[in-house]
Amino acid sequence: MSRNFSMQAKVFIKPLVLFQIIDAYERRPKGDNQVMGTLLGRNKEGHFEITNCFPVPHKEHPEINRIDLDISYASEFLELNMLTYSNERVLGWFSTGKSVSRSASLLHDYYARECGEIQPVHLVMDATLKSQRLSTRLYCAVEIGVPGGTKGLMFSLVPLEISNGNSDLVALRSLEKQSLQQGTKQMERFLPELVQVVDATRDIQQRLDLVLRYINDVLARKRKPDNVIGRALYAALTAVPLLDSEKFRLMFNTNLRDMLMAITLSTMIKTQLEISEKLSCMQDQ
């Protein structure tokens, strides 16, 4: 995405970014109608991928068409993020709503300076979910106006595609499975971690049965061997270190105890935060 950006180019976005925006919208200060923040990502030979984001505190003044961003907060948070993810750069900004707001041109000027040589993009997402759909659109500003006269900006749609990795698919399938379960008392809760482990183990067992059936058929000359499948099986077997059953059982039980300890600690912290929040509300009243 250079200054001569092609409107036919595609920009990819990670599902985690969408969940981060929804989380920021749910945690927005009382009285605020929308949230906005910085989009971060990578640029690889003209292919852009939005991988991260963070909200930026702001205050709108619609009567005078002005918006005040907490620039110091945005700069400090960006610097902190760069220490952890040094390959991420500013790609633009996001805001919640149904369409591009009037303050978009003002924010474009700020993020154009932050993006440097690339042109910033603007992600608009309807986080209210009133239509039961997550409406997400990506825009890019184009200069319009008469030569020698006053210039303006027009925000045009840019193709956007969700990029799913293996870890993303696991999480999305878990969310989909939970959302399709009817009759549960708490639909908003995730599946217990141990249930997910059992489901993953059952899926691996089914795949192993399929592989063993194929190998036995090839050895019994019931099926013609496939070199592509053989190389894939060889790569899968050599990628896993050779362990005896006792060492594997010990390693699995150790990881399982660590996971149970993490679940217990997170539950205790969550309960403590809920109690602290209720006590603070009682003091305010």
UniProtKB/Swiss-Prot annotation:
InterPro entries linked to this entry: eIF3f, EIF3F/CSN6-like_C, JAMM/MPN+_dom, MPN
Chain ranges of the MPN domain: 11-145
Could you tell me which Gene3D superfamilies the record lists for this protein? Answer: Cytidine Deaminase, domain 2
Q: Assembly state and interactors?
A: Component of the eukaryotic translation initiation factor 3 (eIF-3) complex. The eIF-3 complex interacts with pix.
Query: What are the protein's UniProt keywords?
Result: Cytoplasm, Initiation factor, Protein biosynthesis
Tell me the protein family, please. Belongs to the eIF-3 subunit F family.
Which SMART domains does the entry mention?
JAB_MPN
Q: Name one Pfam family in it.
A: JAB
| Entry's localization field | Cytoplasm
Q: Name it.
A: Eukaryotic translation initiation factor 3 subunit F-2
Q: Its GO CC terms?
A: eukaryotic 43S preinitiation complex; eukaryotic 48S preinitiation complex; eukaryotic translation initiation factor 3 complex, eIF3m
Q: What does this protein do?
A: Component of the eukaryotic translation initiation factor 3 (eIF-3) complex, which is involved in protein synthesis of a specialized repertoire of mRNAs and, together with other initiation factors, stimulates binding of mRNA and methionyl-tRNAi to the 40S ribosome. The eIF-3 complex specifically targets and initiates translation of a subset of mRNAs involved in cell proliferation.
BP GO terms, sorted = formation of cytoplasmic translation initiation complex
- Recorded GO MF terms: metallopeptidase activity; translation initiation factor activity; translation initiation factor binding
The protein's superkingdom reads: Eukaryota
The primary location reported for this protein is cytoplasm
